[in-house]
Amino acid sequence: MENKIAPFSYSGSSAGNSSSGGVVSSSLYSDQLYKSTRNIMQQRQDMVNREALCYTRLHEASLEAEALRLENTELRSMNLRLKNELNSLIRSSIQNRFDHRSPLRMLSNLSIGGNDADEVENQNRTVNRDDVNDKSPTSVMENEDLNRSSLPKSISVRSNGYSKASQGGGGAAAQSGKPRGTVTKPGTCGQVSTTQKVYVRGGGKKEDQEEEIEVEVYNQGMTKTELCNKWQETGTCPYGDHCQFAHGIKELRPVIRHPRYKTEVCRMVLAGDNCPYGHRCHFRHSLSEQEKLVAAGFKPKSSLKLIT
């Protein structure tokens, strides 16, 4: 009978051990499940935090973009306002420039030595000097605020009397028999300084409204017939009143010129070279559109180099 009980007790002991092992396995599984669940929740919380941070940064970026947009709009409006002010300033400056030059309208038919213009020849008539007074035509120019850099180097008057003045060395003065102030200027190659009177057309727009203006003209090279370079550059001259050149438009005397003065283009300029005579050249330096095409057809002169 003992042999039958012993196996029973052994089997019972085995059953107890099996039950104990099952409890241990269940607790381990619960711990692992808890840890994995906790890790998953931690990862989810991290994702939520990162998403919130992204939303925060996106909101800040949108606010910064809006601020930049407002600043850009303000800069555009400021730029437009400055542009309008600049345009108004330019218009007023141009208007003032035209207003300052209004006293010079009487010389619209004259050829300005510093500015080459393709104008129609003036049909001027020479008259006897005894029938007119000695008042200079430049006395009507009352404006002293002109920019020195924009003043002409000389005032040229085309006249048929130029040929008469060049013949006989006296022109109208020799014909009238009363030479006036024939003074030889030093450094002008002994040129005789004579004056005569000519008529030029005024600045009227219509031919019937044009009034002839009496102008006293001088020969080239006489005193005060060209603007002083030193005065034009700095506004002062070391020679002062003893300077032989003009210090302003009021002192500038008109110079009588040949009727074809400044009517033909300078060949050196047309060939693309620099004219050594500058504003003293008797030919035009400004080119028309057709002359520019002709000048473009000239091939530039290649400099010849001597090879030794």
Swiss-Prot record:
InterPro entries named among the record's database cross-references: ZFP36-like, Znf_CCCH, Znf_CCCH_sf
Bias (Polar residues): 148-164
Record's compositionally biased regions (Low complexity): 9-21
Tissue spec: Highly expressed in secondary cell wall-forming tissues and the xylem cells of roots. Expressed predominantly in inflorescence stems, flowers and siliques. Highly expressed in the basal portion of stems, where cells are undergoing secondary cell wall thickening. Highly expressed in meiocytes and tapetum from anthers.
Record PTM text: Phosphorylated at Ser-111 by ASK7/BIN2 in the cytoplasm in the absence of brassinosteroids (BRs).
Coiled coil feature spans: 56-91
Function summary: Functions probably as a transcriptional factor that activates genes involved in secondary cell wall biosynthesis. Functions redudantly with C3H14 to regulate secondary cell wall formation. C3H14 and C3H15 have overlapping roles in the regulation of secondary cell wall formation and anther development. C3H14 may contribute more to secondary cell wall thickening while C3H15 could be more important in anther development.
Protein name: Zinc finger CCCH domain-containing protein 15
